């Protein structure tokens, strides 16, 4: 039986984002290996990080809630059927300190997250550090989830961040919101990085961290993307698979393609449609290809007469 991420964080399945963050904050500070002397702290700290990594991500949480840990880590089909391409399974990166750092915005939990008396210090995008040589805070990475339509046409995303801004005295700071604008270009691929230099927390003795957004693709109801190509799964009755057909595909730009199939469609068959994939980032006027796969639907019952007709047609 898969592990229960909600139990790991001590929350219920209907918990909201704020409750998930609060639970992770409390448990991570309690079980951090540099804070706790318990032998089990390292493993608990890792489990807490993995649970938060999943539940704080709407897409991962949605898959986990519906399909459990097995579906999350093993992958799920975009459309159910025997020949359906599957999503890539989730793998925890195994670095709980990375989750801790990204959550609090610093690297050393005891120099930046606790004062001399052990009280917590609130941080966001990199923390205020003590006096000394100016040093830039470690870069902060955030996922930027985009739909295939966003990546096909391009779009503009405005993201609000909260960060510490130095006051006029040059020492104290105030948390203020700022809007960052990202101009998404047609054809951007998953993993594209957008860097906002020195937009992290300000402090008297630090250089603000760079904030980096990393493009992640949302699941799409019709297509799966592979590099610059699109995969489409078309359900088809066995009769049409054997006797030719025309496939209709509604594209991302809302055109209806009518693709004639004159071959016998077998389980490993696919149809390539050149130039109907995603725009190429280097030249958006050019596109990748569309690959059509088929989910052959077999009948569940046949009358004796139909069986005899099939024998005569296929076995003689």
Curated annotation (Swiss-Prot):
It comes from Homo sapiens. GO terms for cellular component: cytosol; motile cilium; radial spoke; sperm flagellum; sperm head-tail coupling apparatus. This is DnaJ homolog subfamily B member 13. It is linked to Ciliary dyskinesia, primary, 34: A form of primary ciliary dyskinesia, a disorder characterized by abnormalities of motile cilia. Respiratory infections leading to chronic inflammation and bronchiectasis are recurrent, due to defects in the respiratory cilia. CILD34 inheritance is autosomal recessive. Pfam families: DnaJ (PF00226), DnaJ_C (PF01556). It is found in: Cell projection, Cilium, Flagellum. It comes from the Eukaryota. Residues 4-68 form the J domain. Keywords: Cell projection, Chaperone, Ciliopathy, Cilium, Cilium biogenesis/degradation, Disease variant, Flagellum, Primary ciliary dyskinesia. The gene is DNAJB13. The keyword Chaperone applies. Functions as part of axonemal radial spoke complexes that play an important part in the motility of sperm and cilia. Homodimer. Component of the axonemal radial spoke complex 1 (RS1), at least composed of spoke head proteins RSPH1, RSPH3, RSPH9 and the cilia-specific component RSPH4A or sperm-specific component RSPH6A, spoke stalk proteins RSPH14, DNAJB13, DYDC1, ROPN1L and NME5, and the anchor protein IQUB. Interacts with SUN5. Interacts with IQUB. One of its GO terms (biological process) is chaperone cofactor-dependent protein refolding. Specifically expressed in testis and trachea. PANTHER family: DNAJ HOMOLOG SUBFAMILY B MEMBER 13 (PTHR24078:SF519), DNAJ HOMOLOG SUBFAMILY C MEMBER (PTHR24078). Its main location: other. GO terms for molecular function: protein-folding chaperone binding; unfolded protein binding.
């Amino acid at each position: 039986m898969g592990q229960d991420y909600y139990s790991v964080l001590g929350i219920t399945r209907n918990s909201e984002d704020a409750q998930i963050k609060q639970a992770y904050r409390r448990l991570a500070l309690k079980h951090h290996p540099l804070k706790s002397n318990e032998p089990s702290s390292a493993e608990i700290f890792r489990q807490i990080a993995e649970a938060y990594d999943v539940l704080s991500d709407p897409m991962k949480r949605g898959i986990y809630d519906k399909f459990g840990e097995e579906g999350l880590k093993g992958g799920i089909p975009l459309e159910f059927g025997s020949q359906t391409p599957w999503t890539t399974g989730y793998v925890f990166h195994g670095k709980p300190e990375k989750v801790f750092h990204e959550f609090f915005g610093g690297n050393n939990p005891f120099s930046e997250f606790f004062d001399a008396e052990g009280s917590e210090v609130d941080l966001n995008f990199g923390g205020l550090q003590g006096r000394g040589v100016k040093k830039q805070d470690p870069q902060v990475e955030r996922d930027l989830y985009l739909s295939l339509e966003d990546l096909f046409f391009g779009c503009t995303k405005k993201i609000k961040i909260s960060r510490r801004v130095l006051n006029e005295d040059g020492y104290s700071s105030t948390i203020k919101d700022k809007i960052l604008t990202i101009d998404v270009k047609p054809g951007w691929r998953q993993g594209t990085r957008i860097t906002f230099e020195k937009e992290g927390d300000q402090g008297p003795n630090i250089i603000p961290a760079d904030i980096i957004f990393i493009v992640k693709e949302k699941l799409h109801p019709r297509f799966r993307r592979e590099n610059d190509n699109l995969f489409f799964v078309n359900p088809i009755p066995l009769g049409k698979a054997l006797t030719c057909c025309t496939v209709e595909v509604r594209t991302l730009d809302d055109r209806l393609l009518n693709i004639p199939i004159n071959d016998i469609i077998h389980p490993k068959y696919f149809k390539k449609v050149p130039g109907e994939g995603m725009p190429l980032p280097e030249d958006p006027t050019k596109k990748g290809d569309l690959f059509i796969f088929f989910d052959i639907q077999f009948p569940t019952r046949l009358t004796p007469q139909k069986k005899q007709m099939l024998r005569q047609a296929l076995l003689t």
